[in-house]
């Protein structure tokens, strides 16, 4: 089994455009192969967009992926 690459996915759920709603943090570990199997930038942005749909996050939800090398951000548009 390959070593895992620690990634922290922070999901900030906003109840309104003023940011007064509830918050949630989800931590995930993705395998090293995730980085080597596809284009780095587009893979993370695509992952964040799919999480919006999979978790049924409301439109306007801010989703940020923090990684040692970079940070990726998407606002859900469902």
UniProtKB/Swiss-Prot annotation:
Secretion signal span: 1-19
Glycosylated residues (UniProt): 37
Subcellular location: Secreted; Cytoplasmic vesicle, Secretory vesicle; Golgi apparatus
Domain of life where this protein originates: Eukaryota
UniProt KW keywords: Cytoplasmic vesicle, Glycoprotein, Golgi apparatus, Secreted, Signal
GO cellular component: extracellular region; Golgi apparatus; transport vesicle
UniProt modification remark: N-glycosylated.
InterPro entries (alphabetical): SFTA2
Pfam families found in the cross-reference section: SFTA2
Expressed in which tissues: Predominantly expressed in lung, where it is detected in type II pneumocytes in the alveolus, and in nonciliated epithelium in bronchioli (at protein level). Also detected at lower levels in cervix, esophagus, stomach, testis and kidney.
Main location: secreted
Keyword field contains Signal: yes
Function according to Swiss-Prot or TrEMBL: Putative surfactant protein.
Protein name: Surfactant-associated protein 2
Gene: SFTA2
């Amino acid at each position: 089994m390959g070593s895992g690459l620690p990634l922290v996915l922070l999901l900030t759920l906003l109840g309104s455009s003023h940011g007064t709603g509830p918050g949630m943090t989800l931590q995930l570990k993705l395998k090293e192969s995730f980085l080597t199997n596809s284009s780095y930038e587009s893979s993370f942005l695509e992952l964040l967009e799919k999480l919006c749909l999979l978790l049924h996050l409301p439109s306007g939800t801010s989703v940020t992926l923090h990684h040692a090398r970079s940070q990726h951000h998407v606002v859900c548009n469902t």
